[in-house]
Structures are given as C-alpha cells and as structure tokens.
C-alpha cells in the first residue's frame, strides 16, 4: 500500500476533532504532532471543537461521562486520582470544582486552589486562599489574570458580600457587591464565558435577568433580560454554547415542559452587553415522559445540568436524578428520546448526592495561569 502524505493543514483540522483522551496518546507519533500541544492556536481551535462532558465523583473515584450520539450511548472514563504534585495528606475536595476555559479549579481542605487538567495529568497549586469558600466561581480579567469570586448572602439583609482572590498573586479583596433587594443571584448556576461570570436572577415582579460579573471592573451588573416570566416551581440552568453564546434551560416542574433559550449572536466583547443588544431565541420546547420533579433553594445548585451538542444545537443532553436518587442522562432531539442509567453513580457516605458538572475537555495547560512571587 502506498502511503499518502496529507497536507499539514488537513492533519491539523482532523486532529482538532479528536477527543483529548485519545489525542494525548498520539504525542509520540512524531515531533510535529507533539509540537501541537504547545501551539496556542491549535489548543484554542481544539477547545472550540470539543464536545462538553460531565464530571462527577463517588466516594473514592472521579469520572467523566462523554455522550456518543451514535446509538446513542454514554462512555464513562475513570479519571486518575493519583494527581501529580498533590501530597497525600492534602486531599482536594473533589465535589468543589469549577470549569473555566478547559481547566478545573478545585478547592481543598488545606488553604489553596488546585488547577487541574485531568487529560494531560497536569496540575498547578496556588496557596493563595486564606479560608475555604462556601460558594465560588472562577474567571479572569482583561490581562488574563485568573481570579476567584467567593460570595455569600448576609443574614438579616439583602446585601451580598464577596471576597476576590487573585490566583497566583497571593492577594485578596473583601468588598460589598453592588446589589439591591429586587433580584437574587442564586436562581441558577453560574458559567464563565471569556472570563466573565453569568447567572440568572429574578426581580420582585418575577422577571428574569441575566447578571454578569466582570473581573476587570470587579462589578456585577444586569447583562440583559429574558423574554419570559419566572415561576417559583421552575428550575433554571445556564450553559455556554460553542464557547461564544449563552443558553438557558427553563424547566416547568408542573408540566415537565422544557424550553431552551439561546442568544442569537455571539458574546465576544466581555465589556459589552447592554440589554437592548442581546436577543434570545426559543431554540426548542420538549416534553420528556416521566421526567423527575426538582426542588431548588437559594443555597443550593440545581440538581440538574445540561448542554447542547456542538454539532447540532437541536440535540439536548440533560443529567439529573430520579425520585430514587439514581442518576440518568437524557438525550433528546425532536421526537427522539433516550434515557441512560449511569451505573458508576453512588450516594456518598454522608448520604448526599454528588453534583454533576459540565466540563469541556481541553489541551490547556495549568501553567498558563500566571503567578507573581511577590508576597
């Protein structure tokens, strides 16, 4: 058989679509292939092509769950817990991790943040946290300085306190977030898009707003409103689509009707997003038979996470628990519906249910996070 040398541009295009768990095995093929892992353009292009996955932990293991739409079926991978650079006496809190641009940020029982790429098996640890947070999110400013926002509601009033940690700079700021009594930040999970945080809030008239927090200005603001009203029985979940748009799931607990909303245009500029500039479209409305009911409180994240297929926005993946506390994945497109049990799931020793998080696998190295040795 005669070998054919493909144009290098075509090779890059093909490799951009290979999942990272497979791609890392190809590093030894040749020096040119290995060099792609240091090519920022290739890493970013690969990240845009990557399909979202789910990540969760049991009592002793941590798993990723990929959806193969041929079938469809799920593929569960156990991630190594022997994390390089992590001392055995310093266990990370595997239920406390957030995704930001393909990196997992994990808080720990010891004072610090572990930055982890499970597919590259690379970590970086920053001992910059002076108390461990209750609720936190990760983003970065216009200089690509990663920061952590630890926020909590104050008892007795509507104010929201926050601590902003500059990861790697060994500094923190304690400040009051600008807020009022007309909205709540805890009506959905938060997501990070281009370094800025977004979440859904509800005003006293049950109008739904998307709030944002810029790590450049260190101020929250109303990003836009949504074209429907909120109901106390509904569950909201926010997600990032194709790294440049926001989507919102609105589940009616009474009818099990699910509506998916999507921003019509890309959100490219992190400082621009006036209410009149953001247009939402109702992407789909689905009704899943025997879909479980949910409870949601301000101090808890929704017991539901979801994402849209990068290659087909009309294909929806939802992960949640049923009434027996068993975890399932629901795959929906039009009239097609499939429910798949996650066999590896188990209730934790404290009888709590582990949270499922959406995670986009990447080739991003933890070393991209800047560090300043000034104390």
From Swiss-Prot:
GO cellular component terms listed in the entry, alphabetical order: chloroplast
Domain F-box: 1-46
Pfam assignment, any one: F-box
Domain of life where this protein originates: Eukaryota
InterPro entries linked: A_thaliana_F-box, F-box-assoc_dom_typ1, F-box-assoc_interact_dom, F-box-like_dom_sf, F-box_dom
Name of the molecule in the record: Putative F-box only protein 11
Gene that encodes the chain: FBX11
